[in-house]
Swiss-Prot record:
This is Sec-independent protein translocase protein TatA. Coiled coil: none annotated. It comes from Alteromonas mediterranea (strain DSM 17117 / CIP 110805 / LMG 28347 / Deep ecotype). The Tat system comprises two distinct complexes: a TatABC complex, containing multiple copies of TatA, TatB and TatC subunits, and a separate TatA complex, containing only TatA subunits. Substrates initially bind to the TatABC complex, which probably triggers association of the separate TatA complex to form the active translocon. The keyword Kinase does not apply.
Length: 79
């Protein structure tokens, strides 16, 4: 009641197959699958690049901070 039954879906599927043909539907499915695969690959590469940039910034920041070579005993002797 109000919803789409299995019979209505089957009729729509038959009409689509008759209009486009199985070869064309297969090609559309292949193209769509390739597009989704490419999108996922681009997203994962972008995440890897972002992680690399964060690590690089942390390394540069830690390298830029001066490192003291004096120990506490050296500081006490100077005072």
């Amino acid at each position: 009641m109000g919803g789409i039954s299995i019979w209505q879906l089957l009729i729509i599927l038959v009409i689509v197959v008759l209009l486009f043909g199985t070869k064309r539907l297969k090609g559309i499915g292949t193209d769509l699958g390739g597009a989704i695969k490419g999108f996922k690959k681009a997203v994962s590469e972008e995440e890897k690049d972002a992680d690399f940039e964060q690590k690089k910034q942390v390394e540069e920041k830690s390298a830029a901070e001066p490192v003291s070579t004096e120990t506490q005993s050296d500081v006490k002797e100077k005072s």
